[in-house]
Amino acid sequence: MSADLSIGNEIKDSFKETHKWVQNNLKWLKDIEQFYRERAKLEKDYSERLSRLSAEYFNKKSSTSVPISVGDTPTTTPGSIEAAGVVAWNEILSQTDMISKDHDQLSTDFENHVANQLSGLFTKLDMTLSKINGFNNDMVNKKDNIYHELEKAKKDYDEACSTMEMARNRYTKASNDRNKKKLDEKEMEMNKCKNEYLIKINQANRTKDKYYFQDVPEVLDLLQDVNEAKTLFLNDLWLKAASVENDLGANVSKRLQAANSVVKQNKPSLNTAIFIKHNLKNWKEPQDFVYKPSPVWHDDEKFAVPSSLEVEDLRIKLAKAENDYNSLQDKTQNELSKLSTLNKIKHEMKTNEDNINATKFYDTLKEYLNVVSPFTSHETLKLQAEVQIESIQNNVPEEYDLSTDNIDLSKTKKKSGIFSKFKHNILNVDSKPSSGGSTGNGNGGPLHITSLFNTSRRTRLGSAPNNAGEDSDNNSIRTTSTNNTKKTTQNSSDDGKNKVLYAYVQKDDDEITITPGDKISLVARDTGSGWTKINNDTTGETGLVPTTYIRISSAATVKANDRGPAPEVPPPRRSTLPVRTMEAIYAYEAQGDDEISIDPGDIITVIRGDDGSGWTYGECDGLKGLFPTSYCK
């Protein structure tokens, strides 16, 4: 079957619609099961009762064709178009209506080899569907819990601000040592609450992204696999029902061969394709959470660390997060390896759709579900720890020591985390920073911090449709490798110098490759895009590099011979995403200069997807322009 088709990639945040669609298809099995049981009885009475039964199920098919094909709430009405499975079912009913008589053996065969198997198929698929639904509910509950934690942190912060304001008023009225001490204590408590609130904002945003770009698509693809497994099993049973009728004679055999030819065209991917086509919708990602100052204590989004007291609290949090992260790293890597292997097996099955084995496919689906559920939970926990580490390390001033070597976690109250890394388009680091320390980015130039409120838009790596020729072990695994989260302590001899912190390999033409040890000079500072233009004095190249991979001293200026307007900020790097293509199934002649002509069989590279207008922007034979989305698959 087609490995490129993925409901999770194409239809965002559509669990309810997809789950209902799969439920309709599983309930449909009961209709088909009942059909064969009734058919077994009617075979004894020959053609008259058999013809009546066929008519009855023609009517049932007519009423369920739309929800089975495109779901209950399609965004585009299908008209007279039916799913391949429904078309195959229609052909079977037509051929059944032409059979005028039968005998007891055929009745027995229908009862034992078809109806009972359909009943068993419904039971096991329904159990799997329930398990997937539980998996989804668990993810939703975890997301909601994290949102609730954010609300609680906000409430605690507001209360701390109010208490601080009251203490300040008392001190203003009576400026004595006792009130001064109370004021300092309340200010420290307020700062702690603020830091916790900022951490929860980070975690909520990252969890939100992970949920919509990784977790939900994973569940949708599992639902897709259940429905496709249903199609595979159903095809086998239909073919079995046809084979027992072949023994009745040449005429019956001839009619059933016609039905078989349609059933064999019922590719699981065709049923998925028509559902996707008629349920595409304009979906907008929910907005990021942002810091909201207390109404009684106006402040900004920066961490509050005016003294070592707040730092000590953050060091404890950092130690706990590092401990959690390290304990979960091996688990997630082992689970990811298993998922990659299963994904490769599933991909190979789907690329050979004509010869796929339903049992093997379903067994792979079940095994994948058993692994992905704990993997997702562990990865979410790891993300919480990772975000907490990043939030603390990137926001504490350099003069404070964040070393956690002397922190005994056994003497502190343990708190469980609920976060893991999610799928985003951060560029891979080819060489990790040294682990010589974790006190900051250096004692020299300013610490470059990626603002909590200026994060670039993330995308779910490996989830876009792949070209047919691609074969990646990690195809559709919604995760990314996590870079070492500890910052590197720089030698004091490097103070005031520009420096390469981490290695980076060029991905686009306007970028350059850098390696720790290279001498660099500033050309244009970061304008907020996360990219800085530099000159690599070692290699002589000039281009963009990630701002967080280098350190530019506060005294650095743009080279005189390179002065001029700041270069245009390049778009977010997406070079790790596979190219998406579409195949033309109908001819179209361009009607304007902004369109391109296509012929059946043309492979078109998608540059910009359909925005809901019915048109896609792509490139074919070197020409770029718009073409009708519905003319391609």
From Swiss-Prot:
Low complexity compositional bias, start-end: 474-493
Subcellular location per the Swiss-Prot or TrEMBL entry: Cytoplasm, Cytoskeleton, Actin patch
UniProt keyword annotations, A-Z: Coiled coil, Cytoplasm, Cytoskeleton, Endocytosis, Phosphoprotein, Repeat, SH3 domain
F-BAR domain span: 5-271
SUPFAM superfamilies, sorted: BAR/IMD domain-like, SH3-domain
GO biological process, one term: response to salt stress
InterPro entries in the record: AH/BAR_dom_sf, F_BAR, FCH_dom, SH3-like_dom_sf, SH3_domain
Keyword Transferase: no
Role of this protein: Plays a role in endocytosis and trafficking to the vacuole. Functions with type I myosins to restore polarity of the actin cytoskeleton after NaCl stress.
Family to which the UniProt record says this protein belongs: Belongs to the BZZ1 family.
Identification of the protein by name: Protein BZZ1
Organism the protein comes from: Saccharomyces cerevisiae (strain ATCC 204508 / S288c) (Baker's yeast)
This protein's encoding gene: BZZ1
